[in-house]
UniProtKB/Swiss-Prot annotation:
PANTHER family: CHROMODOMAIN-HELICASE-DNA-BINDING PROTEIN 3-RELATED, CHROMODOMAIN-HELICASE-DNA-BINDING PROTEIN 3-RELATED-RELATED. Residues 1-80, 170-258, 1120-1141, 1186-1212, 1248-1295, 1754-1787 are annotated as: Disordered. This is Chromodomain-helicase-DNA-binding protein 3 homolog. Belongs to the SNF2/RAD54 helicase family. GO terms for cellular component: chromatin; histone deacetylase complex; nucleus; NuRD complex. The lineage of its organism: Eukaryota, Metazoa, Ecdysozoa, Nematoda, Chromadorea. It comes from Caenorhabditis elegans. Residues 56-71 have a biased composition (Basic residues). It is found in: Nucleus. The gene is chd-3.
């Protein structure tokens, strides 16, 4: 080794020693004392001390150690020549033996690492030892460690002894240069004074002198280096400090200038956690206090820089100077190039005459364009209301006489030619936090500079070429005389509603001086969060009136002093009205204010009510007197007047009288439905002008403003912020009445329950009928002095609800529900009714409109009986026949099943299209809508409704149609579309503002809507439709009170015409029987107390009563079978014999029905028996014409009904009536399935809706019907007509104009003509079926809401929908790029569902040709054979049956209908014989999931069990195929798959087979077991299909897995397999009692467990490697929209429609060239060895470890070894593991 190398090693070791010394110095306090002694020694010897050198602490430690070594050098033996025992003895320590074979010593490469590792061993034996003294021992130990490792074959570079670097020393000629010696040897070598050679140059004295001289020179050199190093370090510190201070100063300056600084990071720089952080003032880093210094308790004050900035200085942002942009070569306005002015601050260029206004002189010096000098608005824009065009004229062109040259200024300032005025846009904007009065027009330039994003979003919603036109801009009724502010011209015609500019009230003020205030103004029809602050001198209409009203209220409530400027306003206003001074009015008012006795009855309405201009009806005044009487007695009240009698007005004026007469100051709480809040506000403003009413509704921000400004005059009485808390003080409350909704009662209970309420009014009090509701419980906890409940139906269902109302009113009196109901269990008795009235008398007041409104237009209710159509009769009889088992008394049908049958029959009475089968078979137009004539003729109610509505339309009447079925409303919409009527609709799904908008549109003057469709339940609450005078109850509700609520929407105060109510009842049906029962038994006992059919559980009517309802009219219905049955199109035959009793509604009968002038029977002399008989007394039967025109029909009907009630019912009635029909229908149904007697099809050749290929159908008909008279000539003629119709239809479709992309119709946004409901229906259909097919007319994909869309419009919307899915739009954006609203569309979820349904359908189609269309064809054949035998047994004259075998056709189910085996017509030729059990048909099905799921493991285990005739009873892959096929047919439901529909379909009956044994167990929840299993199984199949698709795509692009990704997995598997094979016999020996084998077995099992855990972890990471296939957009380097356009246009020959855009079906089914499937499968050694014989028995997995390993490997290899569909009928597949097999139950 050279000297240079020695020197390098010496230097490294010396630095290493220094670092060790520094480490040792920090470990103990004793070292500090030793360092001080060493410093004193150095000072005494003249060595520079640490303080003189100004060394940092590490250098101080180094110097101190050097002195210590020098001082103690004589005591230590040489560490390079001594052992560790000697060094330990010399130091005074106990030696430690260290095992160098430990794993932690194998990576040691230097002394420092070795010392840190050995130090704990030494300190453990020698506690408290100074670490500095251990260093020699470390050196010796390290030398021994190196020798030990070298002896064991591992070479470690040995530590070299340190050497000095020679320093040149000037010597005299006599002196001889001493050979170089190492410093350590020179220090440790002792001078021997007994050297015999004496003097000379080699003497010891001379050697010591040279050593001292050399050390002195070395110390001086080190001193110079140290000083230079200290100076450099100090300079760096000073530089960093200056940089930090400069950074702080710069930051403060930027902050003062308002420059937005970069935000600090949100997590700690050290621990990357959030919390309370210290922010650095010179960078963006943040730290926890504890992360900087664990001993720091408080953060430092003032400016603070983080450790990074202290060490490295502040971050310097290097800003690269961008090159100056060149100006445009053309004018930004006109795009011309000559004579342009260049902006000095931006790249824009302009002509001087293109600027608005034009320049008059050429600017000198630097010039900035209009875009640069336009000022930024001080406010933020809230929204853009409208825009308009603004014309800008150009200056006169430059004119030069001949021979004259234009000056340079003129050339620049004037255009060279005459230029037409140009147009620029102006935007009408609403400023945030400012009122609509401050809306302004802004130029397009300003908007483009400062609000680019807002403008861009605005253009997505409106047309950028045609300004929007609002309703107010087209009205001409406004005159400037009545509009001094020119509001219409300035605001209304540009989208501002007039109410938005009208002051509702002032809610607060701020005073700057005695006569200067700002007011917080709340605007009409805007929520409180839009309230704005306005100055008192702002010019706003009626602003002074609002200010005066505000101060009057404060004066009345607080006796607050009115400011002088407001007093001047008041005096000026009174002087203009001719009134005297205000003081005189106050004095007179005090004199008149006398407290009136509350027991005094009002004979006339009081003056303060008359001052409002309103007049109360006498009955309303009586109601107020009654409420005042109840108040005086402390009796809580129920005001139960019939709807429309003004309960709102009576309750408000009652509270108003209490306040005006001084009985109470309030406050009052009114809880009402949200839909009626607006009506309450209007009535309070009209009847109670001095009431300060606060409407406490809205979102969280609005309610926060209300609590802060409207609850109390005391500042801080309510804590600000969104969190609701109790009010701090109840003094000086600001309001008299708080009007709120049921929801706010629950949400803001904290503050509302903390107020002491003088009275409570609950509107629609039947919300309190359930004492378990949240509303009931919360409201009971309020502190309320008096309660008033308002309800139009106090007894809606039963006495329990009435008890809950009384319990809320008087909980101390009504607290035992059981005793109450028991006492009134027999309400039908007169004395009990009287007792109930006496009990309710003090609490309830109820008047009827018939009793009190003698001057109000009357209402007349008629029962209109209609006939069943032929199609309805067919379905009616079919429902009864199909439910024969439930109807037959012998079979014990339940009450619930009978109620379900009644519901089905009611649907049939409404319209047969409510049934799915009739809906699918109904004639439809090309666009999918129902054919109009068939729609009307197939329902008897529609036939009459058509005639009635046409005459009502001609007479100028308007109609409300009520139905309790929303599906019926859908069909009624189709009816209105067919008839061309405009309509509105309200059902349970339409709430809030949409409901109110529909009502306002219908009630608007001149509204074109003729019909209003309402659901009975949703249409009976908070709706005023007095503009309609005709009510049609299409189907009666179970609860008649709901019908009363419904038609009261029209018959109420405000109605000017007589109201006609027509109740449709189908003759001879359950509807008629139910109506007749209600007509005779409408006392409280039948439908109120006992709840009847209105009860939810349906148990209040006995089975006998239900059976009586079902029997009504059935006998007559089935007697009509001798007449020919009409077809589905509703057209009868000419040979039909008319029924003499059939009701015929001709024109004369309809005119008589609609006659409003005829006198109502019994109108004068009839006296109402009791208020509970309102429903009964309102029933009137309409007069209609019959064939016999018998006037005594009604009497006969009544007599018959009464007699029928006393007759004993025949227990065999249903069996006699239906058994024969039931058997016939069973036979007919089975024949239609494909076996039995051939059914000749009845073909109507005159129909225009025949098949597409007429000639083919004609040929088929000729084959079936011999001797047909229709020849080919007729076929050709019809073919020609068909071609003509087809060409005409195509011409119309081509000429059809698409609706606009976005349009607003009736307040709703339409997209390509699709309203919100239709868009929702399209989305739901996509989520259920995937994307629609190409042939829309033949598809069942379309839903009802989309049938009226043409094919062109439908495809256009489908294309738009897909284009939106392909847009890379942010999920939280409100609209797509074209402005279409997103409406919460989840792009990822929709695409996933479309892809999944596509994969699923493709998989089913792949194997459908092998497996057929029926899952269990043999079961179907058995059913056909049974039907054939039943048909033979019913033949007349049957004597004997030949017993001969029947040939069973075992061909697949896709055979032609003509090849099906036929049943002979004669009984003697019928063959019946017990056939042997047919073999189960083979099948094929496979999913190649690559072993990534447990699907194949389950299949192997299941198919071992599914043998020997158990192919249907054990679930396996056959069932999985049929489950997928069923999902492909039925699709997804709203949230999940509806497995009930699948299990009810006979085609998929195999799905039910595995559950039959479970269903027999009564302790098992049968439905729950099935649904859970099917959901779990389908989820597994879904995952497998997705993985197969990923594998297919990976193989299609030759994607291979990297060996590194599966290498670790293969290694772990090899170790697992090796361990298992090596210990195969251990388990057997352990069972024989070998203890050693038992210990080895436990150790082996533990090792296997670890290996399996690692293997599971590796397998879990494998599917992620498949997802690494690059997306299509990345592989094609195209955006999603470009790919979509390529697929649509198909200009590329490779992208032709005939070629699929995706890879082929599956790599394991149709292999492609150069495909390598093995590279995308897991490479396990056992993957390719899975062949077992068919006779192999299931392996006993618990008995052998190796068996488990082998089966686990085989389970993941099934899909990898097959390239074709798997035919499991020919061979068996090996079993899977026990774990996989036991994860599913074996059904």
């Amino acid at each position: 080794m050279s000297d240079d190398q020695h020197e390098s090693i010496d230097g490294d070791e010396t630095m290493e020693e220094d670092s060790m010394l520094a480490e040792g110095h920090e470990d103990g306090e004793e070292d500090v004392g030793e360092d001080e002694e060493e410093v004193e020694t150095e000072e005494s010897q003249g060595v520079p001390t640490t303080s003189e050198k100004k060394k940092p602490p590490p250098k101080k430690k180094k110097g101190g150690k050097k002195s210590s070594k020098k001082k103690n050098n004589c005591d230590y033996p040489d560490p390079y020549k001594s052992t560790s025992a000697e060094i330990s003895a010399a130091i005074g320590l106990t030696d430690v033996d260290v095992d160098y074979e430990q794993e932690e010593f194998q990576s040691i490469t230097n002394l420092k690492n070795f010392s840190s590792l050995v130090k704990p061993y030494i300190l453990k034996v020698n506690p408290g030892t100074n670490v500095t003294k251990m260093y020699p021992l470390f050196q010796v130990k390290y030398k021994e460690f190196q020798d030990h490792m070298t002896a064991h074959g591992k070479s470690i570079q040995k530590q070299q002894r340190a050497k000095f670097v020679p320093v040149p020393v000037p010597v005299t000629p006599q002196e001889k240069i001493i050979p170089q010696k190492t410093r350590s040897s020179a220090r440790r070598k002792r001078r021997d004074g007994s050297d015999g050679e004496g003097g000379g140059h080699d003497s010891d004295q001379e050697f010591e002198a040279l050593i001292k001289q050399h050390e002195k020179q070395q110390d001086e050199a080190e001193k110079g280096k140290e000083e230079a190093r200290i100076n450099r370090a100090a300079a760096k510190v000073d530089k960093r400090k200056a940089a930090l201070e400069s950074a702080r100063a710069s930051k403060r300056a930027r902050k003062e200038q308002g420059v937005v600084e970069e935000n600090h990071q949100e997590n700690c720089e050290v621990c990357n956690q959030d919390g309370e952080l210290m922010l650095c003032d010179t960078c963006t880093r943040a730290y926890h206090v504890a992360c900087i210094d664990e001993n720091m308790e408080q953060p430092p004050e003032g400016d603070w820089s983080c450790p990074h900035c202290e060490e490295h200085g502040p971050d310097v942002l290097i800003v690269e100077e961008e090159p100056a942009k060149a100006n445009m070569d053309y004018c930004r306005i006109c795009k011309e190039t000559s004579n342009i002015l260049l902006c000095d601050t931006c790249p824009s260029s302009y002509h001087a005459y293109c600027i608005d206004p034009p320049l008059t002189e050429i600017p000198e010096g630097e010039w900035s364009c209009p875009r640069c000098i336009i000022p930024e608005p001080a406010q933020r824009i809230e929204k853009i209301l409208s825009w308009r065009w603004k014309e800008i004229s150009y200056p006169e062109p430059l004119e030069c006489k001949e021979g004259e040259e234009a000056s340079k200024d003129d050339v620049f300032l004037k255009p060279p030619r005459k230029m037409e005025p140009r147009r620029e846009r102006e935007f009408f904007v609403k400023w945030k936090y400012l009122a609509y009065w401050q809306c302004e027009w802004l130029s397009e330039t300003l908007m483009d500079v400062y609000f680019t994003a807002l403008v861009r979003m605005y253009w997505r919603k409106v047309d950028s070429e045609n300004p929007p036109i609002f309703e107010e801009s087209t009205l001409s009724r406004h005159h400037s005389d009545h509009d001094p502010y020119k509001l219409r011209e300035r605001f209304y015609q540009y989208g501002v509603k007039p109410e938005w500019m009208q002051i509702h009230r002032i809610i607060n003020h701020l005073s700057y001086a005695k006569s200067q205030q700002d007011y917080l103004v709340k605007w009409k029809e805007l929520s409180y969060e839009h309230a704005t602050w306005e100055r008192d001198d702002t010019d706003i209409a009626n602003y002074e009136d609002a200010i005066i009203k505000y101060w009057h209220h404060r004066e009345r409530m607080l006796n607050d002093e009115v400011p002088r400027n407001v007093q001047k306003m008041i005096a000026k206003q009174r002087e203009a009205k001719g009134l005297g001074p205000k003081e005189d009015e106050v004095t007179s008012r005090r004199k008149k204010r006398e407290k009136i006795d509350i027991l005094k009855k009002y004979e006339v309405q009081p003056d303060f009510i008359s001052e409002t201009g309103g007049n109360l009806h006498p009955y309303q005044l009586e109601g107020i007197n009654w409420l005042r009487h109840c108040w005086s007695n402390g009796t809580d009240a129920i005001l139960a007047d019939e709807m429309g009698l003004g309960k709102t007005v009576q309750s408000l004026t009652f509270l108003y009288t209490l306040m005006k007469e001084g009985h109470t100051k309030g406050p009052f709480l009114i809880a009402a439905p949200l839909s009626t809040i607006i009506n309450w506000e209007r009535e309070a403003e009209l009847w109670c002008p001095d009431f300060y009413v606060v409407t406490y509704v809205g979102d969280r921000e609005s309610r926060m403003v209300i609590r802060e400004h409207e609850f109390s005059f005391v500042d801080g009485a309510v804590r600000g912020g969104p969190k609701v808390s109790k009010i701090k003080t109840l003094e000086n409350l600001k309001f008299h009445v708080l009007l709120t909704s049921y929801e706010c009662i629950n949400m803001d209970k904290a503050i509302l329950s903390s107020i002491d309420w003088a009275a409570l009014v609950v509107d629609e009090a039947h919300r309190l009928k359930n004492n378990q509701s949240t509303f009931f419980k919360n409201l009971r906890e309020y502190n309320i002095q008096y309660r008033v409940l308002l309800t139009g139906t106090p007894l809606q269902n039963n006495l329990e609800e009435l008890f809950h109302l009384l319990n809320f009113l008087a909980p101390d009196r009504f607290n035992q529900l059981e005793s109450f109901t028991a006492e009134f269990s027999e309400i039908s008795k007169e004395d009990q009714i009287e007792k109930l009235h006496n009990l309710l008398g003090p609490h309830m007041l109820r008047r009827l409109k018939a009793d009190v409104l003698t001057g109000m237009p009357s209402k007349q209710e008629l029962i209109v009986r209609v006939e069943l159509s032929a199609m309805q009769k067919k379905y009616y009889k079919n429902i009864l026949t199909r439910n024969f088992d439930a109807l037959n008394v012998k079979n014990g049908g339940t009450q619930m099943s009978l109620i379900n049958i009644i519901m089905e029959l009611k649907k049939c009475c409404n319209h047969p299209y409510l049934f799915m089968k009739a809906c699918l078979e109904a004639p439809k137009l090309k666009n999918g809508m129902y054919e109009g004539s068939a729609l009307i003729k197939n329902a008897g109610k529609f036939v009459l409704l058509q005639k009635m509505l046409r005459k009502l339309k001609d007479g100028g009447h308007r109609v409300l149609i009520f139905s309790q079925m929303t599906m019926m409303l859908d069909i009624l919409e189709d009816f209105c579309d067919v008839e061309g009527y405009k309509y509105e609709r309200i059902d349970g799904s339409i709430t809030g503002q949409q409901r109110q908008d529909a009502i306002d549109r219908y009630n608007a003057p001149g509204a074109k809507q003729f019909v209003f469709l309402l659901s009975t339940r949703a249409g009976g609450l908070g709706i005023n439709l007095a503009t309609a005078d005709t009510v049609i109850i299409y189907d009666s509700d179970w609860n008649p009170h709901n019908d009363i609520q419904a038609f009261s929407r029209a018959h109420r105060l405000g109605q000017k015409h007589k109201v006609m109510i027509y109740r449709f009842v189908t003759k001879g049906s359950v509807e008629e029987r139910i109506t007749s029962v209600a007509k005779k038994k409408m006392l409280l006992t039948h439908l109120v107390v006992r709840a009847g059919l209105g009860a939810k559980d349906g148990k209040s009517m006995s089975k006998t009563e239900l059976d009586d309802v079902l029997r009504w009219g059935t006998e007559e219905l089935f007697k009509e079978e001798e007449a020919p049955v009409e077809g589905a199109d509703g057209e009868g035959t000419s040979s039909k014999k008319p029924n003499e009793q059939e009701i015929v509604w001709d024109d004369a009968a309809v005119d008589f029905l609609l006659d409003r002038n005829k006198e109502e029977e019994g109108q004068d002399g009839e006296k109402k028996e009791h208020w509970t008989n309102e429903y009964l007394s309102s029933f009137k039967v309409a007069t209609y014409n019959t064939k016999e025109a018998d006037d005594a029909d009604d009497d006969e009907d009544e007599t018959e009904v009464i007699k029928e009630g006393t007759e004993e019912q025949d227990p065999n009635y249903w069996e006699k009536l239906l058994k024969h029909h039931y058997e016939q229908d069973q036979e007919t149904e089975l024949q239609k399935l494909g076996k039995g007697k051939r059914v000749r099809r009845q073909v109507n050749y005159a129909s225009e809706n025949m098949g597409q290929d007429w000639s083919a159908q004609n040929n088929q008909q000729q084959e079936e019907d011999d001797g047909s008279e229709y020849g080919s000539d007729n076929g050709e003629l019809l073919q020609t007509d068909e071609d003509y119709e087809e060409r005409r239809r195509r011409r119309e479709e081509r000429s059809e104009k698409l609706p606009p992309l976005l349009a607003k119709v009736n307040g709703q946004i339409e997209v390509l003509g699709f309203n919100p409901r239709q868009r929702k229906a399209f989305y739901n259909a996509v989520m259920r079926w995937g994307m629609p097919p190409q042939d829309l007319t033949q598809s069942s994909w379309q839903v009802r809401d989309l049938r009226n869309k043409s094919e062109k419009v439908f495809k256009a919307y489908s294309s738009l929908f897909m284009r939106h899915l392909c847009e890379p739009v942010v999920d939280n954006s409100d609209s797509f790029m074209d402005g279409v609203p997103r409406e919460g569309l989840n792009r990822q979820a929709v695409l996933s569902r479309i892809g999944l349904m596509s994969i699923l359908r493709k998989k089913v189609q792949e194997f459908e040709k092998f497996n057929g269309e029926w899952s269990m064809p043999e079961t179907r054949e058995k059913m056909l054979a049974t039907a054939a035998q039943a048909s033979v047994s019913n033949l007349p004259g049957m004597i004997k049956i030949k017993e001969e075998p029947i040939d069973i056709d075992e061909t697949p189910m896709d055979v032609d209908q003509s090849n099906i085996t036929k049943t002979e017509e004669l009984a003697s030729e019928v063959k019946v014989e017990e056939e042997p059990k047919a073999p189960r048909l083979p099948y094929k099905f496979n999913i190649c999931d690559g072993g990534y799921t447990e699907l194949h493991s389950l299949w192997i285990n299941e198919e071992k069990v599914a043998r020997n005739g158990k192919e249907y009873e054990i679930w396996h892959r056959r069932h999985d195929f049929w489950l997928l096929a069923a999902v492909a047919v039925y699709g997804y439901g709203r949230y999940q798959i509806n497995f009930q529909d699948i299990m009810n379909d006979p085609k998929f009956s195999i799905v039910n087979e595995p559950f039959k044994q479970t269903g027999a167990d009564p302790a098992t929840n049968f439905a729950d077991v099935k649904n859970k299993f099917l959901a779990r199984r389908f989820k597994l199949l879904e995952q497998s299909l997705v993985i197969e698709e990923q594998l297919r795509r990976a193989a299609h692009i030759n994607k291979q897995q990297s060996p590194d990704q599966v290498g670790q997995l293969a290694q772990h598997f090899s170790e697992l397999e090796h361990t298992a094979d090596a210990h195969v016999n251990i388990a057997r020996e352990s069972n024989n009692g070998n203890r050693n084998a038992n210990a080895i077995l436990h150790k082996c099992l533990a090792q296997l467990d670890d290996l399996l855990s690692d293997l599971k972890t590796d397998v879990a990471r494998l599917p992620a490697t498949i997802s690494q296939v690059r997306p299509v957009t990345e592989r094609l380097q195209m955006s999603e929209r470009q790919i979509l356009s390529r697929l649509v246009v198909a200009k590329d020959p490779d992208a032709a429609p005939s070629k699929p855009a995706l890879p082929p079906s599956g790599p394991f089914i149709t292999p492609l060239f150069n495909q390598n499937f093995t590279t995308i499968q897991p490479k396990f050694p056992s993957l390719f060895d899975c062949n077992l014989s068919p006779d192999d028995e299931p392996i006993d997995i618990e008995g052998s470890i190796s068996a488990a390993v082998a089966e686990a490997s085989r389970a993941s290899s099934i899909a990898a070894t097959k390239d074709e569909p798997m035919d499991t009928s020919d061979k068996d597949i090996p079993s899977t593991s026990a774990a996989a097999g036991s994860s599913y139950p074996r059904y």
